[in-house]
């Protein structure tokens, strides 16, 4: 499968001829610019390329995850779990995938607050939403892992061990990262279109956009993805980011 650092957007969204596609190459310096370009294209579609008329102008907002509530859960046996929640001086990443040494699985959880001046109004109409995470490392370095992103609601926003289980914390929807995450993605941002999940979160009236990031269902890959989640001054440039365009 192809590397996960390519994001494809239907050309029809940008007003081009049917059947063609735009490919945006995602790398460590261009991914957030690429997402902004996509959002701008969708904004033009939403308003017909004109500011004239009664249609509200789309708004683009960028929301960093909450490092106090982000975390991961490791399943250590069929009925036991280790929960890590909150970034600290010694913990500045979250994990997703299967440890190739211990064969225990990790699932990462990210929390994006939707309230406040920089959030998304409860009555907003969602145009698009993209999630970006910086791949800090991959274990082993030559491994590859298919990644699934699920919309969940762990409220109050405190993780418990059974949140690992899809049966105990059922997803409201899910999307897949395009292509496996591989060594080529280390040090780069991986982006995934979560528009359908954001629309569902709005429909449910969720006050936070919360996701569970895990290895996709199927045969195990025995590869662990390390997602950067720093609390250092460069957090705005490296932390998980949700970009939402709405009207």
Task: Say what each PLM segment does.
Residues 43-46:
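C-terminal motif of bacterial Sec signal peptides marking the signal peptidase cleavage site
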Residues 138-207:
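Beta-strand-rich interaction/scaffold domains
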Residues 78-137:
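A short beta-strand-loop element at or near the start of a globular domain
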Residues 5-35:
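Bacterial N-terminal signal peptides that target proteins for export
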Residues 109-113, 120, 125-134, 191-197, ...:
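Residues within well-ordered beta-strands of beta-sheet-rich folds
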């Amino acid at each position: 499968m192809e590397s996960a650092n390519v994001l494809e957007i239907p050309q029809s969204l940008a007003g081009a001829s049917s059947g063609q596609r735009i490919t945006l190459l995602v790398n460590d310096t261009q991914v957030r610019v690429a997402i902004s370009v996509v959002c701008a294209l969708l904004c033009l579609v939403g308003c017909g390329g004109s500011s004239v008329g009664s249609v509200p102008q789309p708004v683009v907002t960028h929301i960093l995850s909450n490092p106090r509530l982000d975390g991961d859960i490791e399943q250590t046996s069929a009925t036991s779990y280790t929960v890590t929640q909150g970034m600290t001086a010694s913990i500045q990443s979250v994990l997703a995938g299967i440890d190739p040494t211990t064969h225990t699985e990790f699932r990462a959880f990210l929390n994006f607050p939707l309230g406040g001046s920089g959030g998304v109004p409860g009555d907003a109409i969602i145009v698009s939403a993209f999630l970006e995470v910086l791949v800090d490392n991959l274990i082993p370095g030559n491994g590859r892992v298919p990644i699934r992103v699920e919309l969940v609601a762990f409220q109050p926003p405190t993780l418990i061990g059974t949140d690992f289980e899809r049966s105990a914390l059922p997803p409201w929807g899910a999307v897949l990262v395009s292509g496996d995450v591989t060594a080529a993605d280390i040090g780069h941002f991986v982006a995934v279109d979560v528009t359908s999940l954001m629309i569902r979160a709005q429909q449910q009236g969720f006050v936070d956009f919360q996701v569970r990031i895990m290895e996709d269902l199927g045969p195990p890959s025995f590869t662990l993805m390390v997602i950067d989640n720093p609390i250092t001054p460069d957090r705005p440039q490296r932390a998980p980011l949700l970009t939402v365009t709405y009207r």
